[in-house]
Amino acid sequence: KADIFCLQETKLQAGQVELDLPGYLQFWNSAKKKGYSGTAVFTRTAPLEVTYGIGLPEHDTEGRVITCEFPGFFLVNCYTPNAQRGLSRLEYRMVWEDAFRAFLLSLDRSKPVILCGDLNVAHQEIDLKNPKPNRGNAGFTDEERGKMTSLLSAGFTDTFRWLYPDRTGGTADTKSEAKRS
């Protein structure tokens, strides 16, 4: 049994569902908009503190971040905004990325950070099965990939890529466009 597990894109409002998971504490962050985004953390160990969002009202209405502080680390569960078809939210996403990275770095100054979640980006071509037809699509724009590079350059590690440096198509998947599969 997992000590901690995290969900993204829960699309649930507070009290909409009751999960019977004996031994787990549950923490939910719901979007103000019904049926949209949301995150949840389930843990067997009580966190010292749980915070919701990144502390900026312009970014904290979509239920995208839960941070659990434990004695030796912060666990951050994140559901990064999608740039959407036609890249209609790309500009917002870029602003969000900078604010989120600053949030992570502020935590990292006091203790290590474990970031998990759906970051909505394929950082490298190796992360997609068919990268060429996806170049410029949401999740694989130069801008989004650049923000992921900035996160990694700030000292964070893509643990999947660290463990499996040559595995193709392993970190990004989408159900919305057949050409990505």
Where on the chain are the PLM-derived regions?
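Structured beta-strand-rich core segments of catalytic domains in phosphoester-bond hydrolases
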Residues: 11, 16-85
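Surface-exposed cleft-lining segments at the edges of enzyme active sites
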Residues: 55-56, 81-97, 132-137
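Proline-aspartate-enriched helix->loop->beta-strand connector
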Residues: 1-6, 10
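Active-site acidic/histidine proton-transfer and metal-coordination neighborhood
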Residues: 77, 87, 94, 105-108
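Metal-dependent phosphoesterases centered on the DNase I-like endonuclease/exonuclease/phosphatase
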Residues: 4, 23-25, 96-181
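Residues forming well-ordered secondary-structure scaffolds
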Residues: 61-63, 70, 91, 95, ...
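A cross-family glycoside hydrolase active-site/sugar-binding cleft signature
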Residues: 8, 79, 116
